[in-house]
């Protein structure tokens, strides 16, 4: 969640504006966040200003709107006058401070937190194997990567591969009863294709989606279950009992 937001604006007001009467209004989702009056000293010069944004008004999808109120004379103004302008620089940016939440290991919101449609950044989702994957493991990973990739669309996606290690971010783990990364060596054996959500052993804010199986064929069946969407995700772990051919 966002705990702090600060809008950093670079702008240049027209030298013909009336000070104080001319101003720049800042809105977030149509709520007024602040007003920047144009002073005499700022006319025709580049100005840097900061506007605090109340994080309580930040939603899943947000819009920052700037409204210029400009005056160049006290009476008989022409609203279409070429002297009425304020140029906002492309160096302007919104600075956000985040606080991670300790999410429960609950698959009912899957594919969150591994993919969130509200996040417009490129998806980076590491794939972790015990060692170099064989052909069936590669097929399972390709199915899951394709499924996530079909959802990211224009955002783009990246699936870095790691052997017998753990990244510091949400990841997909492939493990069988006989072949698994070291951090899962004490995990109990499974008797069916299983999908489990667990916390990173060193960071509870990072989640791991573990695709478990008795063997590689189970991994492939679990991957197909995810792709076909016929798995009822709930709780921290589910089994994939049947998939379409």
Predicted regions and their residues:
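Solvent-exposed alpha-helical segments and adjacent loops
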Residues: 1-245
């Amino acid at each position: 969640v966002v705990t702090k937001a600060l809008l950093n604006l670079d702008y240049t007001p027209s030298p013909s504006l009336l000070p104080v009467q001319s101003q720049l209004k800042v809105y977030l989702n149509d709520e007024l966040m602040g007003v920047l009056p144009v002073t005499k000293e700022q006319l025709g010069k580049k100005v840097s200003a900061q506007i605090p944004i109340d994080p309580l008004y930040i939603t899943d999808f947000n819009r920052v709107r700037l409204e210029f109120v400009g005056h160049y004379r006290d009476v008989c103004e022409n609203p279409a006058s070429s002297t009425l302008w304020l140029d906002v620089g492309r160096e302007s940016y919104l600075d956000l401070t985040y606080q991670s939440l300790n999410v429960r290991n609950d698959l009912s919101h899957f594919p969150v937190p591994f993919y969130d449609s509200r996040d417009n950044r490129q998806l980076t989702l590491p794939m972790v194997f015990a060692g170099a994957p064989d052909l069936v493991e590669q097929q399972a990973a390709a199915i899951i990567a394709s499924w996530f990739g079909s959802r990211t669309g224009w955002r783009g996606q990246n699936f870095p591969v790691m052997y017998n290690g753990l990244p510091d971010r949400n990841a997909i783990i492939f493990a069988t009863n006989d072949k698994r990364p070291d951090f899962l060596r004490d995990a109990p054996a499974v008797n069916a294709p299983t999908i489990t959500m667990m916390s990173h052993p060193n960071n509870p804010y990072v989640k791991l989606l573990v695709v478990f199986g008795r063997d590689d064929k189970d991994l492939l069946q679990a991957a197909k279950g995810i792709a076909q969407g016929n798995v009822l995700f709930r709780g921290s772990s589910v089994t994939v009992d049947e998939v379409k051919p």
